[in-house]
């Protein structure tokens, strides 16, 4: 008897890949990828708020534990089959890259640099994802694709540099490492989601991390939580539920449908969504330069999409 798709994961969450309609799959991939990027855009501002009151290592382990418990409940409730023996190693790579590596390295980096400073490195994430898509996913974008990808990354980095950056070698190194492990985790997860399913990949990766994250989070927990403010708790909830789980459901599905290198270029928009979010929450002014660069980056994303295959 065929397994019925759970209603909770209908719409963009469903496995909708159709080999008979690659154009529809590509469009769905870009839609799912865009939703994922919007969700991820709140990650750095939320992490910045949370790390002011939570120790970075504990924050990383706690968010992974909370998301992992929820992921385990979903897998049990929907009676998902266990991954095959060949799929466990890629799941470990995903867990090390996006469940532990990127959250931990960014949390540590944000002790040294501001969210605006980190835009320089987030601007390199689409390029890193595309490179690992070639190395791990076997993709072969056309040469013009790389031109648009590098140009888009340069625009984002140039805009961030124009805002003024302070010297923080430790923070810079941590952010660079975060981008590399995240790009690997994105590409590996997207490749695996073609056979395992988008939401299943991130759920199993979170479950893989539980035996480490759960006991360590209990060991490193502070003696009391009485001094933690409501914004810090809300930030923890966001990075645990949205950044660690829901965002990846859309993101991995989008990468699998539309191509790792191609859909990965949507990440060029993430810094600007993050700045817009900061402006809305913190009432910071959005400059004309930000608007102009955003338009130019959208053009690079469109160009990359056209020449991705």
Where are the regions a protein language model picked out?
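Glycine-/small-residue-enriched transmembrane alpha-helix faces in small-molecule transporters
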Residues: 2-61, 104, 108, 164-191, ...
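Juxtamembrane helix-loop-helix junctions in multi-pass membrane proteins
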Residues: 38-68, 114, 184-209, 222, ...
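Specific transmembrane alpha-helical segments of multi-pass solute transporters/efflux pumps
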Residues: 38-39, 43-44, 72-122, 158, ...
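Membrane-interface helix-cap regions at the ends of transmembrane helices
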Residues: 42, 46-49, 53, 67-84, ...
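Helix-helix packing/entry segments at the starts of transmembrane helices
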Residues: 61-62, 103, 117-124, 188-211, ...
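Transmembrane alpha-helical segments that form core, pore/gating elements
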Residues: 71, 129-131, 135, 149, ...
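Hydrophobic transmembrane alpha-helices of multi-pass small-molecule transport proteins
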Residues: 71, 92, 132, 141-161, ...
């Amino acid at each position: 008897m065929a397994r019925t798709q759970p209603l909770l994961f209908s719409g963009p969450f469903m496995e909708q890949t159709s080999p008979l309609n690659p154009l529809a799959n590509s469009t769905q991939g870009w839609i799912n990828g865009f939703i994922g990027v919007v969700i991820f855009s709140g990650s750095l501002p939320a992490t910045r708020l949370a790390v002011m009151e939570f120790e970075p290592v504990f924050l990383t382990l706690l968010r992974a534990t909370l998301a992992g418990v929820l992921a385990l409940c979903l897998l049990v409730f929907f009676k998902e089959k266990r991954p095959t023996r060949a799929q466990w190693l890629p799941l470990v790579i995903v867990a090390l890259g996006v469940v532990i590596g990127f959250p931990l390295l960014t949390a540590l980096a944000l002790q040294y640099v501001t969210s605006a400073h980190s835009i320089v490195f987030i601007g390199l994430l689409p390029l890193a994802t595309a490179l690992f898509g070639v190395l791990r996913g076997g993709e072969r974008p056309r040469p013009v694709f790389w031109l648009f990808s590098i140009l888009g990354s340069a625009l984002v980095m140039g805009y961030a540099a124009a805002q003024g950056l302070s010297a923080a070698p430790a923070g810079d190194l941590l952010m660079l490492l975060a981008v590399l492990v995240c790009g690997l985790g994105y590409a590996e997860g997207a490749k695996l989601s073609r056979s395992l399913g988008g939401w299943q990949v991130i759920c199993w990766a979170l479950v893989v991390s539980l035996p480490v994250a759960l006991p360590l989070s209990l060991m490193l927990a502070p003696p009391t939580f009485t001094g933690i403010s409501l914004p810090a708790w809300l930030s923890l909830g966001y990075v645990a539920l949205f950044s660690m789980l829901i965002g990846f459901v859309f993101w991995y599905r989008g990468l699998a449908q539309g191509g790792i290198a191609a859909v990965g270029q949507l990440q060029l928009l993430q810094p600007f969504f993050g700045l817009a979010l900061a402006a809305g929450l913190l009432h910071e002014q959005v400059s004309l330069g930000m608007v102009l660069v955003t338009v130019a980056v959208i053009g690079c994303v469109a160009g990359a999409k056209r020449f991705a295959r």
